[in-house]
Amino acid sequence: MKIYTVGHSNHSAQYFIEMLKTHQVDCIVDVRSVPYSRFQHFNKEEISASLKKENILYLPFADEFGARRKERALLDEQGKVDFEKVRSSAPFQRGIERLTNGAAKGFTIALMCAESEPMQCHRFGMIVPALRSEFEILHILKDKRVKQNTELEKDLVKKYKTDIATAYKLLNKEIAYTP
């Protein structure tokens, strides 16, 4: 099974939809904790309506995959969100199950957040590690090209000069939210 990730960045609504259509995405899973943007066309209500016109399903997954957690049990010793703890949580596991079921039903799913660069976003650092054994993961870039997750992981290992498991932990420390 295949799953995409994408960042809406500051794109126009039309360009963003073109990005999705280029890869036949028919289901957007919004992983933003707060599904609103300074670019109003990416606010939950507006993006949902725009996608519906294009026959693309919109699903808000803030509870399952949002990165701005406040529960103490999901924070590390420094008070930052601990991605491993989030991945072990019941809401996150329900989200994985919903993604798997959707993909099995034939939906072409993309996880959407705001950040254009996947390595700077929790969709890569927090969510992808839970998907990498079940899915082929492709990151849609600004220019509509895709980058294989295996290539992004090579970049991550190179950045931190360590193994992939440790590199994901270091990325967590770098990008995690502090409530």
Regions found by a protein language model. Give the residues of each.
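Residues lining hydrophobic/aromatic ligand-binding pockets adjacent to catalytic sites
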Residues: M1-P179
